Amino acid sequence: MKQLSFLPGEMTPQDRRLIQRALRALDRHLHEPGVAFTSTHAVREWLRLHMAALEREEFRVLYLDNQNQLIAHETLFTGTINRTEVHPREVVKRALHFNAAAVILAHNHPSGETTPSQADKTLTQRLVQVLQLVDIRVPDHLIVGGRQIYSFAEHGLL
């Protein structure tokens, strides 16, 4: 099986079309009735395909209902090559707009390094705190760096 390049300048048009088809298929799967995020595998693959080749940091939120089914997803903030300013108030506002019971947070590190910075850890703690005030759970915060993904939940940081 051919390895896909995740560097934007190295992707062939064929690779881009293949990724777009995979994203559409995963999107359809994630929006099927009854599909719950009991396993993070599909979420990770979806995020990897969406975010691995981005040249600037993006902060995304996946909004889930009480059964952990996807309600909606969106990019809330876009930053520079090594930083994104995230406003907790906006995250809460959008989660309430979608009537979410839980949110999965995600952002990318264009450098490919997935280890969270102290700023990442502080932001995550702050978001968990403010979302708890309105009874919204945060099952995970994922950092995408190329083909690698770091999970705050798996590392005991949530």
Swiss-Prot record:
Binding positions (Zn(2+)): 107, 109, 120
Recorded family membership: Belongs to the UPF0758 family.
One Gene Ontology MF term: metal ion binding
Stored Pfam families: RadC
One GO biological process term: proteolysis
SUPFAM superfamilies in alphabetical order: JAB1/MPN domain
Residues covered by the MPN domain: 36-158
Motif (JAMM motif): 107-120
Protein name from the UniProt record: UPF0758 protein YkfG
Keywords, ordered alphabetically: Hydrolase, Metal-binding, Metalloprotease, Protease, Zinc
